[in-house]
Amino acid sequence: MRQPAALALTLSLAIPGLGAASGVSGTTPPRQQMPTASPEQEAVEYYNDGISYRDKADKYEAEAGAENDAAKKAKLLEKSKSQHESSIKKFLKAVAKNPQMVPAWGSLGYAYRKTGNYPVALEAYDKALALEKTYTPAIEYRAEAYLGLNRLDDVKSAYMTLFNTDRKRADELTRAIDRWLEKKKADPAGIDPVKLEEFDKWASERKQLAAQTSSLTSGQELRW
């Protein structure tokens, strides 16, 4: 006569060895635990996620620059800003996990600058440079934030530092200065016209000098 399933289970628990013989186990095997990532590893993951958002933001911005339709341009710029805002969340998590991660601080400043938050951008750049004073990406990014705040003497100082240490970044700042000058010549609001003219002359002289000299160094942005 076939035993009911419940009775068979009861017997297997009551009689040693019966459970194993019948294929019924009275114990649950321990779960295998996955290794826990270190804070530094988690920071790298957040940083890479942020870079992914940043790359998309830069792509939308480039497309906007080539777009002639005003409505389409505005839409692309809004998409770019949204991606930068997403990158900020990731970079904040990265520096929370690893406050010593210089590239994350620099990229955080970049994202804040691109969304128009210059004061907070400067704080992030200052943090990066406090950790590594020769980190040229942050020097260049911070100089562009200075442009947004019309801090022209600080821009000049940053340019000279880059010119002597990282010519590639100096050239990048030169292009940013050219864009800034173009906008300010069309609308000089917030800046003394005399100072604008002096800065324009200085920038022109620096470009001529740079064209006459060979590249000294070539800085590379860190990727994690």
Question: What do these predicted regions represent?
Answer:
Residues 28-34, 164-224:
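Terminal, low-structured helical/coil segments at or just beyond the last alpha-helical repeat
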Residues 55-56, 114, 148-149, 183:
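Register position in tetratricopeptide repeats
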Residues 61, 76-93, 114-127, 149-158:
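Structural signature of tandem alpha-helical TPR/SEL1-like repeats
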Residues 107, 141, 175-176:
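Canonical tetratricopeptide repeat
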